[in-house]
Amino acid sequence: MPRSRINGNFIDKTFSIIANILLRIIPTTSGEKEAFTYYRDGMSAQSEGNYAEALQNYYEAMRLEIDPYDRSYILYNIGLIHTSNGEHTKALEYYFRALERNPFLPQAFNNMAVICHYRGEQAIRQGDSEIAEAWFDQAAEYWKQAIALTPGNYIEAHNWLKITRRFE
């Protein structure tokens, strides 16, 4: 049974109903419709913490989806799952792949910066300040890109850049 029929959340049900109506109205191929169904089911599973199911749906959506912009969001969501699972190297890979298809994803830049900052903090705890600085510098670059795309967002990152004198 499609996930859209079993989800009990009002907002998710409403989204599913509207999405189904739009899929009938908007001229799309059956492959695009099927890709969107997998994407929608992946988002639903992800929101419930069912990451294995979400990944299966996202991989199917990737197999079917041809539009680079739409693929960027699928890849981004796969990156989110890997981030949640602590698989930071994999997460970075998927965020990079998302940005290759859509360079206007500030949330991907932000998440990459958060991972780099976390790795910098880990390096400090391990007593390696040189490696830590390299990770912090990389985090700064990603945060600058996120902020450039959406000025006024990422206030904490902006403040960190100022405090650490990494903002130009």
Swiss-Prot record:
It is a peripheral membrane protein. NCBIfam families: PRK02603.1. Pfam families: TPR_1. InterPro entries: PSI_Ycf3_assembly, TPR-like_helical_dom_sf, TPR_rpt, Ycf3/AcsC/BcsC/TPR_MFPF. HAMAP family: Ycf3. PROSITE patterns: TPR, TPR_REGION. It comes from the Eukaryota. The gene is ycf3. It comes from Daucus carota. One of its GO terms (biological process) is photosynthesis. This is Photosystem I assembly protein Ycf3. Keywords: Chloroplast, Membrane, Photosynthesis, Plastid, Repeat, Thylakoid, TPR repeat. It is found in: Plastid, Chloroplast thylakoid membrane. Its main location: plastid. GO terms for cellular component: chloroplast thylakoid membrane. Belongs to the Ycf3 family. Essential for the assembly of the photosystem I (PSI) complex. May act as a chaperone-like factor to guide the assembly of the PSI subunits. TPR repeats lie at residues 35-68, 72-105, 120-153. SMART domains: TPR.
